[in-house]
């Protein structure tokens, strides 16, 4: 099982796409719980959390501090951090479940293969995917899944990250 945390900074139209993509994983029992995290009170995030049945957490600080605070309240042994507007696709549910079960107690993490938004530049996604393959370091735009204890103590950002073959689609608005 995995918990999902989605940092929300402002009104994020792509957040609804991200949540919709997670519904099958919730129904299948892969996703145990989901929380939206914001650094300040956010009416949009509160409304979405209320309508979708997910939790909301307001905690100050940078992204790493928000992930750590989220890890402290979530219940699953693994956490998937997604940016609003990023949509896991393909066979991601099976692939991430297999990765978690194969990882055992090893401190490993995984991230998706980033697919650019239609009409957007393709160089940045290619560079991010290349960097992940060569250095084992993921960008937040690739969705990071790591053990909850590694998210809680901040070490998830230092783990070697395996790249999943499942894509994560960029559905964010063109201005981002």
Language model segments and positions:
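Short aromatic/hydrophobic "clamp" motif used to bind/position activated sugar donors
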Residues: 79
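Catalytic-site signature of metal-activated, phosphate-bearing donor transferases
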Residues: 95-176
